[in-house]
């Protein structure tokens, strides 16, 4: 992960820890205290007394627990929904991408999505495998092709909305697009995936999971809504 990506995810954690403040307020506050361009290294040097002295709100309630979350985010100790895990001696057997604006709820439209949260699954369960962003730099490819290539190692994509042409594009990349009901959390959908994988897989999914003998074919699980076939 580049420094730019590391900075982005730390800042996202900070924005979520300080919902009473606008993102621009938080950036200006930290930039003022650091005295330099914000980098992961500069964020980690900031102290709570230093930040408290210039806190940009007279109405936001800063409890010890909230300060603890802020300082942890500055130092790179991100909350569980933003913390990549590398469990020893476990190999991903299925990867699912979630299009989300916050890493908590499946609330992204694929054609507008900029953040993708990749979860890996095996017989023991799932874990946050990677965090990916739609690139900000100019690119030659069509936007949804860029998104498809960003998650092309995944077998499933969960989003709130997706258009027909975009769904067809994903299927050409051997990614199955799935629409989640409004308000569905990533955690709830991961639990549904675990339940599915503990039983028998639908043929269209089992076909893409070569070398897995524990997961067998079955009818399609009603936990999921298939966008296109």
UniProtKB/Swiss-Prot annotation:
Pfam families cross-referenced by the UniProt entry: Nitro_FeMo-Co
Key words of the record: Nitrogen fixation
Top-level taxon in the UniProt lineage: Bacteria
InterPro entries: Di-Nase_FeMo-co_biosynth, DiNase_FeMo-co_biosyn_sf, NifX-like
UniProt entry tagged with the keyword ATP-binding: no
Record has Ribosomal protein as a keyword: no
An example Gene Ontology biological process: nitrogen fixation
Protein family according to the UniProt entry: Belongs to the NifX/NifY family.
This protein's name: Protein NifY
Species of origin: Klebsiella pneumoniae
């Amino acid at each position: 992960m580049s420094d730019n990506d590391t900075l982005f995810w730390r800042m996202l954690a900070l924005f979520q820890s300080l919902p009473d403040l606008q993102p621009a307020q938080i950036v200006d506050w930290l930039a003022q205290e650091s005295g330099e361009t914000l980098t992961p290294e500069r964020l980690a040097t900031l102290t709570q007394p230093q930040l408290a002295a210039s806190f940009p709100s007279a109405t936001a309630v800063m409890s010890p627990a909230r300060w603890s979350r802020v300082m942890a985010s500055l130092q790179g100790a991100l909350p569980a929904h933003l913390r990549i895990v590398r469990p020893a001696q476990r190999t991903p057997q299925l990867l699912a991408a979630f299009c989300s604006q916050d890493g908590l709820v499946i609330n992204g439209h694929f054609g507008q999505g900029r953040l993708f949260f990749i979860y890996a699954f095996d017989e023991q369960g799932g874990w946050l495998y990677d965090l990916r962003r739609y690139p900000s730099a100019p690119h030659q490819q069509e936007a949804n092709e860029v998104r498809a290539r960003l998650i092309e190692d995944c077998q499933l994509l969960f989003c709130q909305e997706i258009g027909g042409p975009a769904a067809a594009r994903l299927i050409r990349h051997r990614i199955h697009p799935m629409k989640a009901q409004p308000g569905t959390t990533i955690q709830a959908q991961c639990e549904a995936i675990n339940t599915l994988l503990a039983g028998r897989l639908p043929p269209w999914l089992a076909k893409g999971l070569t070398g897995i003998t524990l997961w067998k074919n079955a009818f399609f699980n009603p936990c999921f809504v298939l966008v296109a076939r």
